[in-house]
Amino acid sequence: MKLALVGDIGGTNARFALWENDQLHSVRVLATADFACPQEAIKLYLSDLDLALGAVGSVCLSVAGPVSGDEFRFTNNHWRLSRSGFCKDLQVDNLLLINDFSAMALGMTRLQPEDVRQVCPGIPDPTRPAVVIGPGTGLGVGTLLNLGEAQWMALPGEGGHVDLPMSNPREVQLWQHIYNEIGHVSAESILSGSGLPRVYRAICAVDGHTPVLDSDRAITAAALAGDPVALQVLEHFSCWLGRVAGNNVLTIGGRGGVYIVGGVIPRFADIFLASGFARSFADKGCMSDYLKGIPVWLVTAPYPGLIGAGVALQQAFG
């Protein structure tokens, strides 16, 4: 039987792995800037594993951008491909392109207990949708549906671009400063790596501090070292994420639970777990009891997008 190859293509890095027996192996990370197209990167990957062209029968790539038609242009790097040309060049039978956040959502179906940390307790209802939300370069939001008989459907959306919710005078003050800086304040403009400096500048402006930190990583490092202003930034970030996640649950009836993915939260996981996220998540007035029984997990698995690409391949081609 031919092997299957999966890839998770980002703006800077492309991750590749082989998918066999419901498992990943031989994960490699390559810089997209080093290659003119994905075929070149995959050829090097296969060569490093001493695999010839034609050894792989099916490929699934998790990509950013619309995936219809033969021609595909990556929105986060310089790569582009033709489906037919890709298959001919690499001697593969099948190429499946899947939205990157759909792959992330499908990856939730293979998580093990050690791949998550509990944020809010509860028992998921497997007959209801689950929310997948991911602060990273942007804010990804998707829905995961259990279709039964080991079949899953991931529905990507644009939930990261909803308006940022406010629930107290302090948040209104910060929102006003951010609005004066950037105009429309979407959830993504705050709940992303670039959002942390915006919240930091807003707190400094409102409270009369001189800003000295200029990046999300600097703010996170300062918070881990005990800086009180940086800690405020992470607290507001966590509470806003709770409100947005709770709103998504109410919108879709997401009693299947909430999975938090992406690269931002794991940098300050312990601070996040002690934050006001859970309180803000369930702070929905007459619907608070509805939210209190819904579990929330922080996903710590290193390659959920690759796993999701494997699940998509398995469902598409068996």
How would you name each of these model-derived features?
Residues 18-19, 43, 72-74, 109-110, ...:
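Short amphipathic alpha-helical segments
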Residues 32, 76-77, 96-103, 122-125, ...:
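Active-site nucleophile and cofactor-binding loops and adjacent substrate-binding regions
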Residues 50-97, 102-115, 132, 265-270:
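Short beta-strand-loop/turn "lid" adjacent to the catalytic site in phosphate-handling enzymes
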Residues 94-125, 217-238, 243:
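ATP-dependent carbohydrate kinase catalytic cores
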Residues 115-187, 269-270, 276-282, 286-288:
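Glycine-rich phosphate-binding loop of actin/hexokinase-like ATP-binding domains
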